[in-house]
Regions:
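A short Gly-Trp-Pro
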Residues: 1-143
Length: 143
């Protein structure tokens, strides 16, 4: 995870959209849900949970909204020019958004603390055996 009060910056592949996380990172999870697999074309994606109010965005992302496993809306925010994925919002507790860790300028500044939707993990995908694994997104205390 990040240090308290650490500023994290990132953006899309072409640089048209930039963002800054200025607040506490709530979690850093490797998500194995089928939606993330389809959206990324990989076995999982690494997501950083932050409050929406602590994420500032420069540029206007394009969005795509679908229904998540729970039936709530899941909105993916990405660059309309290069297609770079930036963050996901939706019906999450405490106005949390999930930023794509790979879009950080320096992804090595954070580290996963869990694996979520492990029930959907692909047999060939590998995870740190010391990370806790959850069948779904765990209930987290509100910020």
């Amino acid at each position: 995870m990040s240090e308290p009060g650490m500023k994290l910056e990132g953006g899309c592949l072409c640089g048209a959209i930039r963002y800054c996380i200025n607040g506490k990172v709530r979690f850093v999870s490797q998500c194995c849900c089928r939606d993330c697999q389809r959206a990324t074309g990989t076995g999982h994606t690494t997501i950083i949970g932050v409050l929406r109010s602590e994420l500032s965005v420069r540029g206007v992302p394009v969005t795509y909204t679908s229904k998540g496993e729970s039936g709530g809306d899941v909105t993916r925010h990405f660059c309309g020019t290069c297609g770079g994925r930036l963050y996901t919002s939706g019906t999450l507790p405490g106005a949390v958004v999930m930023v794509q860790a790979g879009s950080l300028d320096d992804p090595n500044r954070i580290a996963p603390d869990s694996v979520v939707y492990y029930k959907d993990a692909l047999s060939w995908d590998r995870f740190d055996p010391q990370l806790p694994r959850f069948e779904r997104l765990p209930q987290r205390s509100p910020p």
